[in-house]
Amino acid sequence: MLLVRNSTLGRLSSLRGFFRNINESNIFYRMVHHKVTIIGSGPAAHTAAIYLARAEIKPTLYEGFMANGIAAGGQLTTTTEIENFPGFPDGLTGSELMDRMKAQSIKFGTDVITETVSKVDLSSRPFKFWTEFNEDQEPETTDAIILSTGASAKRLHLPGEETYWQQGISACAVCDGAVPIFRNKPLAVIGGGDSACEEAQFLTKYGSKVYMLVRKDHLRASQIMQRRAEQNEKIEILYNHVTLEAKGDGKYLNALKVKNVKTNEEYDLPVNGLFYAIGHTPATNIVAGQVDLDEAGYVKTVPGSTLTNVPGVFAAGDVQDARYRQAITSAGSGCMAALDAEKYITELE
């Protein structure tokens, strides 16, 4: 007889071809109930886990298996060097930071499960949820959920982009702009909204010149942001331009193949950095239609808290933050979510 939690049953069943003695008759699964379930794997998720575990509310954290196409640890795992997270004067990689956070949450008693929560039912209490390996099985249940599923930067997936991702191409100027490979070098920003203007302005602190590649013949940004970009001597706005390819020496980016859609002229633009500023996609599919979302798909929370419109469901990190999107702010909101969830659980008892 094999006794497993029901979240593991689907995975074992999928391995039946490798283990001939595994069949439905000798697998007995048990329903699992949690006090607090954290969905996510970034700074918000692990900070929430640390606080809850230290409060003796043993949380379960589903970190996912390549959830939303990103390894456990979230977007930070795609960042080569982090120099602005307090406490690390020598810097460290995003993966190193997340490994330390995960080790700390496990140390205090968090149950970390490497499966992706693919479905939730918030219509009754306790809440129900399923993972991608057990959607046809009985669900697990939980008294509270902390959503910290993050948001992924929109990318163009240009030819050459994978080669030079984090070797000249980034989706966060604030995170990566100060990296040595960008200092005193020509840089480019793709986008025409407020975020693109803000990132271009920020990058002028480090780059010798910043090109804004704008697909249309005008900026979408607010008037004040447009004016600041247009009046900055280090920013050159290339209207009616699209990017066709990322080029380099095999190690680092050194040019973009661009096209003027008005004249059809194609040419190589020498730059050592490309920053996407075309928006983010919050990972809210599993709660769409159950939790209130804003127009961009981010989870709405009560100002000054992590409470959603569903009592017992909390949101932390980039999934509810369209503005800051930093590791430190995500960690802070994870702490808030833990405290909010702890209060909720205490009141239930």
Curated annotation (Swiss-Prot):
Disulfide-bonded cysteines: 172-175
Domain of life: Eukaryota
GO molecular function: thioredoxin-disulfide reductase (NADPH) activity
Chain residues that bind FAD: 41-44, 70-71, 75, 84, 117, 175, 318, 325-327
Reaction(s) the record says it catalyses: [thioredoxin]-dithiol + NADP(+) = [thioredoxin]-disulfide + NADPH + H(+)
Signal peptide coordinates: none
Subcellular location as annotated: Mitochondrion
A UniProt-annotated Pfam family: Pyr_redox_2
Catalytic class of the enzyme: oxidoreductase
Keywords of the record: Disulfide bond, FAD, Flavoprotein, Mitochondrion, NADP, Oxidoreductase, Redox-active center, Transit peptide
Gene Ontology cellular component list: mitochondrion
Residue span of the annotated presequence: 1-30
One of the GO BP terms on file: removal of superoxide radicals
EC number assigned by the record: 1.8.1.9
The protein's required cofactors: FAD
Manner of cofactor binding, per the entry note: Binds 1 FAD per subunit.
NCBIfam families linked: TRX_reduct
Quaternary state and interactors: Homodimer.
Note: The active site is a redox-active disulfide bond.
Family classification: Belongs to the class-II pyridine nucleotide-disulfide oxidoreductase family.
Protein's name in the database: Thioredoxin reductase, mitochondrial
Organism of derivation: Kluyveromyces lactis (strain ATCC 8585 / CBS 2359 / DSM 70799 / NBRC 1267 / NRRL Y-1140 / WM37) (Yeast)
